A protein has these predicted regions:
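Collagenous Gly-X-Y triple-helix signature in extracellular proteins
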Residues: 1-193
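Short, low-complexity, charged amphipathic interaction modules
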Residues: 192-234
Length: 237
């Protein structure tokens, strides 16, 4: 097990039965992303939705809120999930939808641009971002693009499309950086490198060997090591 604070951006780790990738280390917390998306769902399929691309009223938010509440398996895991603020600005950075504080949410378009070199390509599905293509503009009657939301292709490219379509769910979390997490390729720092936990065959047993025999073997090995630096006649080579 390792402290989350010690993991570099781009490192994948296990938490609450899921795999996450570290995006960045912050003051006392780590911003992380689900390593692969979960099942698909519409961003918003509500018939009475006025602005379908407003995350605060979306089907996607309801699904993610339920997912994050069910995610932790222990009280320690639950306490490690910290609330964070999400910027719901649209593509031109207008702020009609404001911000929202949650425990899990998709990345914004700008976070995707910031971290895309660290994000593993999504293997099975396209997935939603949280950023709307456009917000309702009070001085314009045009509302068509208030149905559009940004999403990411499996190859890492990104585009926007109608919120009624179903794409993958790939939330980000903010976790307490003191959290102990496991790694699939983990080798404990204080391990010998030969025992079972390192994948080796274990150390030989010393049961039944006398102290005198052990001391004799130590002396023999010390003399043999010394011959590397001395000639056959005992002088320096």
């Amino acid at each position: 097990m390792k402290k989350l604070a010690k993991l570099s951006p781009g490192r994948i780790f296990n938490f609450a039965g899921e795999k996450f990738v570290v995006m960045e280390q912050r003051d006392g917390a780590a911003f992380v992303l689900l390593a692969q998306s979960k099942e698909s769902c519409p961003f918003n399929d509500k018939d009475d939705a006025e602005n379908r691309n407003d995350y605060t009223r979306s089907t996607l938010k309801e699904r993610i809120d339920k997912w994050v509440e069910a995610l932790p398996r222990t009280s320690e895991e639950a306490a490690a999930i910290l609330p964070f603020e999400v910027d719901l600005s649209c593509t031109d950075r207008s702020k009609s939808y404001g911000t929202i504080t949650v425990k899990a949410a998709p990345l914004t378009l700008w976070q995707y641009g910031q971290f895309k070199e660290l994000i593993p390509l999504n293997e099975d599905d396209w997935y939603w971002l949280v950023t709307p293509w456009a917000c309702r503009w009070l001085r314009s009657p045009c509302t068509y693009y208030t149905d559009y939301v940004w999403y990411v292709y499996s190859n890492g490219d990104f585009y926007s499309y109608n919120a009624s379509y179903s794409y993958g769910i790939r939330p980000a979390l903010l976790l307490n950086s003191d959290l102990l997490v496991s790694l699939d390729d983990e080798v404990e720092d204080d391990c010998c490198g030969e025992c079972d936990c390192c994948g080796g065959k274990g150390l030989p047993s010393l049961d039944g060997i006398s102290t005198a025999t052990l001391l004799e073997e130590i002396q023999r090995r010390a003399m043999r090591a010394g011959s590397v630096f001395m000639g056959e006649d005992g002088t320096d080579e």
